[in-house]
Amino acid sequence: MGLPEDFITELQIPSYILKILYVIGFFRDIVDALCPYIGLPRFLDHNETSAPDLTRHALSTSASLANELIPVVRFSDLPTDPEDCCTVCLSDFESDDKVRQLPKCGHVFHHYCLDRWIVDYNKMKCPVCRHRFLPKEKYTQSDWGSGSDWFSDEVESTN
């Protein structure tokens, strides 16, 4: 009732495959590390991959729409008394901080926090309450994507 005699040799075949895969991965890492030295981009660095031109254009369009519709003002110039801290970075507002106040919900954020939310994370809704801060007509009039509004319709139907 013990193990079969050829059990050890059956286990050695997968270990050879694992060793081969390890060596291939090692050489891949070496080639990736040498790419910048020979003028090629690194192919394993996902943080530095460039977006396609369409995506880059879409991000710049959304950022310019945000600049147009949500102006930057000083925190001390706000007519109402909003929250004491930015809910994106959790830092307290100072009177001379440059902020953006969203028109629909009134939430206030540092301008760089909201800009990063828009551009880096591609979010077009308030970080706190998820209200769309770009009106749908502005969103669809802009060429903020491929021309179809399937994504926003999908999001609208889930809310």
From Swiss-Prot:
Tissue distribution of the protein: Predominantly expressed in stems.
Disulfide bonds, paired cysteine numbers: none
Keywords: Metal-binding, Transferase, Ubl conjugation pathway, Zinc, Zinc-finger
UniProt cross-references to InterPro entries, sorted A to Z: Znf_RING, Znf_RING/FYVE/PHD
Pathway(s) served: Protein modification; protein ubiquitination
GO biological process: protein ubiquitination
Xref: Pfam families: zf-RING_2
Zinc-finger ranges (RING-type): 86-130
Keyword Zinc included in the entry's annotation: yes
GO molecular function annotation: transferase activity; zinc ion binding
Catalytic activity: S-ubiquitinyl-[E2 ubiquitin-conjugating enzyme]-L-cysteine + [acceptor protein]-L-lysine = [E2 ubiquitin-conjugating enzyme]-L-cysteine + N(6)-ubiquitinyl-[acceptor protein]-L-lysine
Keyword set includes Zinc-finger: yes
Enzyme Commission number(s): 2.3.2.27
CDD domains: RING-H2_RHA1-like (cd23121)
Function of the molecule: Probable E3 ubiquitin-protein ligase that may possess E3 ubiquitin ligase activity in vitro.
The protein's name in its UniProt record: Probable E3 ubiquitin-protein ligase RHA1A
Organism: Arabidopsis thaliana
